[in-house]
């Protein structure tokens, strides 16, 4: 019973990052790496972890720049760097084979890991984790696509994006948009996100990652080739009402994955807030060892 309760750790890895992570389940079970997105942390998996820990060994880190992970002063915030830090964590923990649960920013981090360690990936759960241009909903990405045509410190774009990043309402709406009954969403989740993202230096970190996101799109063909070549099983568990990564991004996985299951939920971006039990059941059904 004790194995299903998350244990908390902080460990310094090769690049100087002190990675804070949650761990649960027996180390002898198949490992699933849970990779969160913006603007949250591994806290988004708080309800999923005990549902999976009986069948899996769970590792859920806070990405650099998020949650309680600490970075050195000279850390360069890019998706390449985030991938490198998580790769160091996996090596430090001697984790050789693992499946991934990817969400939002966790998707480009996870797919970079797959390109770096293709033989180590045993499967993917993508919950609103995009790898296709058609999945980029312009209601969210339109302004950022214009920003990418300029330069990172362009004052016009920076001036418009800072209020977006610093307004708590823009965190809350990611939890509420597309959810039929918003009272079903735990307010503690976005309240923690808001508190963490309002810390000193956070706005600059998130601006850098916003600008760098364009480099993820350039890697989409490589991500897709990995899916075709690896033949790994993929579960697409998608909040169908997401206004950041659309259903078109979920459907696009059909082009490159043979061993695929696609499941839609009547909810928004943070599908675990409303459908955690259903998603856990799909993961166990597809990936647990009998």
Swiss-Prot record:
Q: Which one of the record's GO molecular function terms can you name?
A: carboxylic ester hydrolase activity
Q: Which Pfam families match?
A: Abhydrolase_1
The EC code for this enzyme is 3.1.-.-
Question: Active site located where?
Answer: 269
What keywords appear on the UniProt entry? Hydrolase, Serine esterase
| Domain AB hydrolase-1 residue range list | 30-274
Per the UniProt entry, what are the Gene Ontology biological process annotations, in alphabetical order?
epoxide metabolic process
Is Hydrolase found in the keyword set?
yes
Family, per entry: Belongs to the DmpD/TodF/XylF esterase family.
* Protein name (database record): Uncharacterized hydrolase YNR064C
Question: Which organism encodes this protein?
Answer: Saccharomyces cerevisiae (strain ATCC 204508 / S288c) (Baker's yeast)
Q: What is the lineage of its organism?
A: Eukaryota, Fungi, Dikarya, Ascomycota, Saccharomycotina
């Amino acid at each position: 019973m004790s194995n299903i309760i998350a244990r908390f750790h902080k460990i310094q890895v090769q690049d100087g990052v002190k990675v804070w992570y949650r761990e649960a389940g027996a180390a002898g079970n198949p490992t699933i790496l849970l990779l969160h997105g913006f603007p949250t942390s591994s806290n988004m998996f708080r309800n999923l972890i005990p549902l999976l820990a009986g069948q899996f060994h769970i590792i859920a880190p806070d990405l650099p720049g998020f949650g309680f992970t600490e970075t050195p002063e000279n850390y360069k915030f890019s998706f390449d760097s985030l991938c490198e830090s998580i790769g160091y964590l996996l090596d430090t923990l001697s984790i050789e084979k693992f499946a991934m649960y990817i969400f939002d920013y966790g998707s480009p981090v996870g797919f970079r890991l797959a390109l770096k360690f293709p033989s180590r990936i045993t499967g993917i759960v993508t919950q609103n984790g995009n790898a296709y241009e058609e999945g980029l909903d312009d209601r969210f990405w339109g302004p950022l696509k214009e920003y990418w045509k300029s330069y990172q410190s362009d004052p016009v774009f920076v001036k418009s994006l800072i209020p977006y990043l610093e307004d708590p309402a823009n965190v809350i709406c990611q939890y509420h948009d597309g959810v039929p009954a918003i009272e079903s969403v735990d307010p503690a989740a976005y309240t923690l996100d808001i508190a963490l993202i309002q810390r000193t230096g956070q706005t600059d970190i998130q601006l850098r990652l916003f600008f760098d996101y364009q480099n993820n799109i350039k890697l989409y063909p490589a991500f897709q080739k990995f899916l075709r070549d690896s033949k790994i099983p993929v579960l697409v568990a998608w909040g169908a009402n997401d206004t950041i990564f659309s259903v078109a991004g979920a459907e696009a996985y059909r082009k490159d994955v043979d061993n695929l299951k696609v499941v839609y939920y009547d909810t928004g971006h943070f599908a675990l807030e409303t459908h955690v039990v259903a998603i856990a059941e799909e993961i166990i059904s597809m990936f647990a060892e009998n």
